[in-house]
């Protein structure tokens, strides 16, 4: 049975909206995010406890600041969960560069977002493979690595990955920089057999740092 979630538009005279969507059927995860249409938590704002595929359907032309109060979320550059991905963990993000951070790409748009249901910082495991389709040398990872090469991985590319537990964010460059790829054990069955499955924005198999997502 689906659980009703509440999305409240918080303006001078607040209104309440009900939604029948749920991040995962039968799930009662503690997710809550507040978005604003201006930087520094100004202007119109709205709370969400479930996915939003298009903020323009909620009368937002863009998300310019946000607060994550519960859970971990993925923000997307475009509607329908497409484009660049941005990991959104608990905290305040007063401007676009707070969530794109050291992305090294100037992207000020955030048009859709959803909760990460499988994030489990204490119990996370991923296996990376040298080649596509889980072929070649492999390495099981259960911790955060700001530089895979410094810890023993032999090159700057990863061909495929299996997520056994939790959710991970992989980065194009060392030090958690560059494109972000959020990989979850409950998506693709946890199997990412080709780098193109990492996201609609994926353009390369280059992965040089990786960390667990905080719930």
Swiss-Prot record:
Modified residues (N-acetylmethionine): 1
Stored InterPro entries: Beta/Gamma-Crystallin, Beta/gamma_crystallin, G_crystallin-like
Residue ranges of the region described as N-terminal arm: 1-30
Chain positions covered by the region annotation Connecting peptide: 118-123
Residue intervals of the Beta/gamma crystallin 'Greek key' domain: 31-70, 71-117, 124-165, 166-214
Pfam families the record matches: Crystall
GO biological process: camera-type eye development; lens development in camera-type eye; negative regulation of cytokine production; negative regulation of ERK1 and ERK2 cascade; negative regulation of phosphatidylinositol 3-kinase/protein kinase B signal transduction; negative regulation of TOR signaling; phagocytosis; positive regulation of anoikis
Modified residues (S-methylcysteine): 82, 117
Keyword Acetylation: yes
SMART domains linked to this entry: XTALbg (SM00247)
Post-translational modification: Specific cleavages in the N-terminal arm occur during lens maturation and give rise to several truncated forms. The initiator methionine for isoform A1 is removed. The new N-terminal amino acid is then N-acetylated.
Keywords, alphabetical: Acetylation, Eye lens protein, Glutathionylation, Methylation, Repeat
Record SUPFAM superfamilies: gamma-Crystallin-like
Electron transport is among the record's keywords: no
S-glutathionyl cysteine modifications at: 82, 117
Molecular function in Gene Ontology: identical protein binding; structural constituent of eye lens
Domain writeup: Has a two-domain beta-structure, folded into four very similar Greek key motifs.
Family assignment from sequence similarity: Belongs to the beta/gamma-crystallin family.
Xref: PANTHER family: BETA-CRYSTALLIN A3, BETA/GAMMA CRYSTALLIN
Chain's role: Crystallins are the dominant structural components of the vertebrate eye lens.
Subunit organization: Homo/heterodimer, or complexes of higher-order. The structure of beta-crystallin oligomers seems to be stabilized through interactions between the N-terminal arms. Interacts with CRYBA1.
Record protein name field: Beta-crystallin A3
Species in which this protein is naturally found: Rattus norvegicus
Gene behind this protein: Cryba1
């Amino acid at each position: 049975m689906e659980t009703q979630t509440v999305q409240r538009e918080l303006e001078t005279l607040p209104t309440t909206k009900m939604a029948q969507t749920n991040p995962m059927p039968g799930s009662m995860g503690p997710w809550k995010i507040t978005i604003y249409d201006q930087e520094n938590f100004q202007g119109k704002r709205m709370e969400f406890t479930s996915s939003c595929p298009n903020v323009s359907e909620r009368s937002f032309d863009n998300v310019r600041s946000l607060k994550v109060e519960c859970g971990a979320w993925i923000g997307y550059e475009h509607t329908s969960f497409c484009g660049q991905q941005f990991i959104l963990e608990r905290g305040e993000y007063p401007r676009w560069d707070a969530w794109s951070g050291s992305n090294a790409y100037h992207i000020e748009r955030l048009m859709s977002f959803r909760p990460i249901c499988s994030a489990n910082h204490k119990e996370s495991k991923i296996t990376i493979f040298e080649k596509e389709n889980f072929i070649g040398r492999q390495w099981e990872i259960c911790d955060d690595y700001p530089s895979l090469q410094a810890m023993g991985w032999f090159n700057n590319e990863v061909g495929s990955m299996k997520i056994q537990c939790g959710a991970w964010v992989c980065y194009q460059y060392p030090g958690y920089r560059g494109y972000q790829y959020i990989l979850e054990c409950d998506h693709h069955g946890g199997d990412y057999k080709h780098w193109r499955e990492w996201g609609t924005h994926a353009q390369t198999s280059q992965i040089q740092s990786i960390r667990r997502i905080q719930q």
